[in-house]
Regions:
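Long amphipathic alpha-helical repeat/alpha-solenoid cores
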Residues: 1-190
Length: 190
């Protein structure tokens, strides 16, 4: 918990830099916020949200890792440490190539990457991943379950052009459960 004078300093630093003083900003002292803002400005990053979850020196390391590997600096990137990002980048680059080095891919858990990417490769649909990375938010078991469901309703794992994964993979767990229920009800009506 920040003392009131520190909160006043934080609000002042935020106002001076056009940052809304809310949420994760208050996790850092004003001095650290100034350092973070400086790193962000030097690298063309908007100082909002997840950048305030890490110290300025970690943000510098993350920026360095991303720039060295040609990765866009999005908010999601700052949810991982530079070390984790580098491990993921190395794994993906060495095993699958640089075209898979996208923020939505490299920020996933390494175990997820190892199992899911390998599975997608075995299925012959890995090429779709850079354009349709939301499938990585599912576990391997959820992917297999949804794949079985998709086949059961006569659809394919990818869209007709083979450019994106079937939209079923992008559904939230709740929406997916509703879709399954809807299909069961259709079967009952028949």
């Amino acid at each position: 918990k920040q003392p009131s004078e520190e909160i006043e300093k934080i609000v002042k630093v935020c106002k001076e830099n056009g940052i809304e003083p809310t949420g994760s900003v208050f996790l850092k002292p004003a001095e650290e916020i100034e350092k973070i803002v400086k790193v962000c400005k030097e690298n063309g990053i908007e100082p909002t949200g997840s950048v305030f979850l890490k110290p300025a020196e970690e943000i510098e390391k993350i920026v360095k890792v991303c720039k060295e590997n040609g990765i866009e600096l999005t908010g999601r990137i700052f949810l991982k440490s530079a070390k984790q990002l580098q491990e993921n980048i190395n794994y993906i680059s060495e095993n699958y190539g640089d075209k898979y080095l996208k923020p939505l891919i490299i920020t996933k858990n390494i175990k997820t990457l190892q199992t899911v990417i390998q599975y997608l490769e075995e299925k012959g649909v890995l090429e779709i991943l850079p354009q349709s990375a939301s499938i990585l938010s599912l576990t391997i078991d959820e992917i297999k379950e949804r794949e079985k469901f998709i086949e059961g309703i006569g659809e394919n794992i990818s869209n007709k052009n083979g450019t994106k994964f079937n939209s079923i993979f992008g559904l939230s767990r709740r929406k997916y459960a509703q879709r399954v229920e809807k299909e069961k009800n259709k079967e009952v009506e028949l």
